[in-house]
Amino acid sequence: HGFMPIVVKVVEQDEYDEWVFNKREEAIKLAELTTKDWSTAELMERGQTVYEVNCVACHQTEGQGIAGIFPALAGSEIALYEKDRHIEILMEGVQGAAMNSFDYLSEVELAAVITYSRQAWGNAEAGDGEIVIPKDIVDYKEPKI
């Protein structure tokens, strides 16, 4: 075994109880995210809202982007076929480009906006039409061993 330091933080009972409560709430939320049966329509509705708030300034209303500055999402290989890469880009951003990480969005918001951009502007018909569900985002966040 390697060196495994243990850190103990002593807190008042009230603070500990609040921590336990929050951990339980997180576990319940995670269970709901990973077991809910998400419809494409539900993800699209949420995704459009997230897109309009976070993405439209660069990628434009119809996903056409701005030539030479911000890439189009309409008809792009990533939006048509590369689901895992699409998740990675939103989670990590693109180094050396204007695309920042959006990892501060919730799992539901991320799944919804990715699904929206994979389904809108004819992308569903032109590509694989694969949706992203919150569990896909949870799985992406799991540590890789």
Predicted regions and their residues:
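Active-site/pore-lining binding-face segments in mid-to-C-terminal subdomains
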Residues: Y81, R85-A112
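Sequence/structural segment immediately N-terminal to covalent heme-attachment motifs in c-type
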Residues: T40-I66, A74-E92
